[in-house]
Swiss-Prot record:
Gene name as annotated: WOX9
Main location: nucleus
Localization: Nucleus
Listed GO biological process terms: plant organ development
Name of the protein this chain belongs to: WUSCHEL-related homeobox 9
Entry annotated with the keyword Endoplasmic reticulum: no
Length: 200
């Protein structure tokens, strides 16, 4: 039993992040990362493992908890701002600056101890934040084709022309033909499935 007493968190299985892990996560959160993707969580947890034991689920829940705390803090501040005896607060200005997308620069270290590891963290965070911003720019709006299926087809296939689906294409083309069934083998499907595009 004495061998276990020196190790923190072994018995209960709870994750106790090191100061370095908390610092990295906090810097990412302040830089605007709120809901990291699975790939981002994996990369973050891989980096954090250099500072101590961590699992991907720990990183996921850390961000969930901090988003909830931030929402709670904003609600609390809004309630306080609506009361007649509350004045403006310096924290309000700092929080507003963090809410904008332009605030992606990490804050410089405040103590000598922080300054020692700042160079490494600053380079890592700057690259990571740039990567996150570029990745999120690609997520904006995926292009999709709008297709309408006939729910209850009223006719069977009489002509080979009817066995082709038309899909509205992007760019300059109106529609393109895509072979839908194996016409050469002469096999007809039990249902007619036709995808029609309407000018939307």
């Amino acid at each position: 039993m004495e061998a276990l007493s020196g190790r923190v968190g072994v018995k209960c299985g709870r994750w106790n992040p090191t100061a370095e892990q908390v610092k990295v996560l906090t810097e990412l959160f302040r830089a605007g990362l709120r809901t990291p993707s699975t790939e981002q969580i994996q990369r973050i947890s891989t980096h954090l493992s250099a500072f101590g034991k961590v699992e991907s689920k720990n990183v996921f829940y850390w961000f969930q908890n901090h988003k909830a705390r931030e929402r709670h803090h904003h609600k609390k501040r809004r309630r306080g701002a609506s009361s007649p005896d509350s004045g403006s607060n310096d924290d309000d200005g700092r929080a507003a600056a963090h809410e904008g997308d332009a605030d992606l620069v990490l804050q410089p270290p405040e103590s000598k101890r922080e300054a020692r590891s700042y160079g490494h963290h600053h380079r890592l965070m700057t690259c990571y934040v740039r990567d996150v911003v570029e990745t999120e720019a690609m997520w904006e709006r995926p292009t999709r084709e709008v297709e309408t299926l006939e729910l209850f087809p009223l006719k069977s296939y009489d002509l080979e022309v009817d066995k082709v689906r038309y899909v509205r294409g992007g760019g300059g083309e109106q529609c393109r033909e895509i072979s839908f069934f194996d016409v050469a083998a002469g096999r007809d499907p039990p249902l007619e499935l036709r995808l029609c595009s309407f000018g939307l």
